Amino acid sequence: DEVDPDGKVLNSLIDTLMHLQKEFANLKYAFLTVHKARSFGSGSERLYVTNKEIKNFEPLGDI
């Protein structure tokens, strides 16, 4: 006896997996975009960017 003769459960799982793969790809792209926008290198000095200022990471070591 087949529990899912029409493959509805399997098709539903495949659809869900494909949706999650797309969401993960979008999340990964969004993270990389934010990371690239927020930090960048200038020579050997690492910089960070906020909406208010651009500074290097050295002052952050005092926190």
Swiss-Prot record:
GO MF terms, alphabetically ordered: carbohydrate binding
Changes after translation: Contains 2 disulfide bonds.
Localization annotation: Secreted
Protein name: Myotoxin inhibitor protein
GO CC field: extracellular region
Tissue: Expressed by the liver.
Protein family according to the UniProt entry: Belongs to the alpha-type phospholipase A2 inhibitor family.
UniProtKB keywords: Disulfide bond, Lectin, Secreted
Organism: Bothrops asper (Terciopelo)
Subunit structure: Oligomer composed of five 23-25 kDa subunits. Homotrimer; non-covalently linked.
Function of the protein: Binds to and neutralizes the activities of basic phospholipase A2 (PLA2) myotoxin isoforms.
Transit peptide keyword on record: no
